[in-house]
């Protein structure tokens, strides 16, 4: 039951984190700025998450994990409330930064807690359950939030997320046990884990995967509008992606436990890279009446492959010793959001220099690079804490 409440909180965080892609045109119109400039809301959030997560983990290292999760979720809710009343783009940017601090503290801790209370043979599924909160958010929260933003204004979407966060907070207050173990790793040990060659390869793989995905996802509404998609159609496309992501997430957890982490991650990356590259092919060469259907099919394949990778990658890191794995998971989340930040920047550059039809192949090349790195490196080594810290 405790893991379920963690998933509910992840649902609130995932809804806010991904719904912004559907709100960019609405916010751009309201703030009277370009969609590319508005896209930096994604970059600011992701960069704050990437840098803030490990720093906050060290700052609150001696705090009970239950209290840490509650503190993080309160910060996330406060950021959404700030967005509701934001009267300018800089204030909205600041609110996204506050949200990211809360999310960056919450998600790695939640995954670590889920692993700590799960049996060894079910750890992959425990990770998948927590991360499924984020992927289910792409199924329900993102398309619904996008529709609400289009009909009632983007502020209404942030208000909805604040309510979701409050509901999750209530569940954690009453459903999460106390006495969860604290992290005992020092700053030196954390840096030692980050410097370990096997972990660095894993983090680079995650960052490349995330960069490729967000290069396309951040500005997905732009090529879709070019094909004649209206607000309802774009919400439908986001729903298709969300359903596929949820399926991929669960498949990633199950296959990791059955056939292994690296084969599962490799299959996910290959599927994702191919689907992204084919999006560009469809946009450039397919007739518009066919491109609409083809794009939806490719978005579905992309969602399955892309989100099968992440639980497999996380489960691979869990094979490390307990203290190391918790640090590695936090670093992996930072690598993912660093990739998200780079994807937001890359997507904006592609739109400005090339065009919407080029987003897919550039994003796909980044994911393909992640696959090449994964296959080159193979299985992670399992270092000892004393060895890498000493």
Where do the protein language model's features map onto the residues?
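Extracytoplasmic
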Residues: 5-38, 53-56, 216-221
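Conserved MFS/SLC helix-loop-helix module at the cytosolic interface between two early adjacent transmembrane helices
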Residues: 51-90
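Helix-to-loop junctions at the C-terminal end of transmembrane segments
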Residues: 53-64, 248-261, 351
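Paired small-residue
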Residues: 75, 79, 90-98, 290-301
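Cytoplasmic helix-loop-helix junction between adjacent transmembrane helices
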Residues: 89, 95-134
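Helix-loop-helix hairpin linking two adjacent transmembrane segments in secondary transporters
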Residues: 91, 119-175
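Intracellular juxtamembrane helix-capping segments at the cytosolic ends
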Residues: 105-118, 307-321
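C-terminal transmembrane helical hairpin of 12-TM major facilitator-type secondary transporters
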Residues: 263-312
């Amino acid at each position: 039951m405790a893991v379920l409440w963690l998933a509910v909180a992840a649902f609130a965080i995932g809804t806010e984190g991904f719904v912004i892609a559907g709100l960019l045109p609405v916010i751009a119109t309201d703030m009277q700025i370009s969609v590319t400039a508005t896209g930096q809301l994604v970059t600011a959030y992701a960069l704050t998450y990437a840098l803030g997560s490990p720093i906050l983990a060290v700052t609150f290292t001696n705090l009970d994990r239950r209290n840490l999760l509650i503190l993080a979720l309160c910060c996330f809710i406060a950021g959404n409330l700030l967005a509701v009343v934001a009267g300018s783009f800089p204030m909205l940017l600041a609110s996204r930064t506050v949200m990211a601090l809360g999310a960056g503290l919450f998600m790695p801790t939640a995954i670590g807690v889920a692993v700590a209370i799960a049996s060894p043979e079910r750890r992959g599924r425990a990770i998948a359950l927590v991360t499924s909160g984020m992927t289910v958010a792409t199924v329900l929260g993102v398309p619904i939030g996008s529709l609400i933003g289009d009909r009632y204004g983007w502020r209404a979407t942030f208000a909805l997320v604040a309510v979701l966060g409050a509901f999750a907070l209530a569940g954690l207050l009453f459903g999460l046990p106390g006495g969860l173990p604290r992290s005992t790793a020092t700053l030196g040990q954390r840096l030692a884990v980050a410097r370990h060659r096997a972990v660095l390869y894993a983090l680079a793989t995650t960052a490349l995967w995330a960069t490729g995905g967000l290069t396309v996802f951040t500005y997905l509404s732009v090529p879709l509008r070019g094909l004649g998609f209206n607000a309802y159609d774009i919400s439908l496309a986001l729903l298709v992606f969300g359903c596929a992501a949820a399926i991929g997430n669960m498949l990633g957890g199950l296959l990791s436990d059955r056939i292994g982490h690296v084969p599962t991650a490799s299959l996910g990356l290959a599927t994702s890279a191919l689907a992204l590259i084919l999006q560009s092919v469809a946009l450039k060469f397919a007739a518009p009446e066919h491109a609409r259907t083809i794009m939806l099919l490719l978005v579905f394949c992309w969602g399955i492959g892309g989100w099968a990778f992440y639980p497999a990658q996380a489960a691979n890191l869990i094979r490390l010793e307990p203290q190391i794995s918790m640090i590695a998971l936090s670093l992996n989340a930072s690598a993912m959001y660093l990739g998200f930040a780079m994807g937001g920047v890359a997507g904006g550059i592609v739109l400005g220099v090339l065009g919407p039809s080029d987003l897919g192949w550039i994003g796909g090349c980044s994911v393909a690079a992640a696959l090449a790195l994964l296959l080159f490196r193979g299985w992670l080594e399992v270092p000892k804490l004393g060895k890498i810290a000493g």
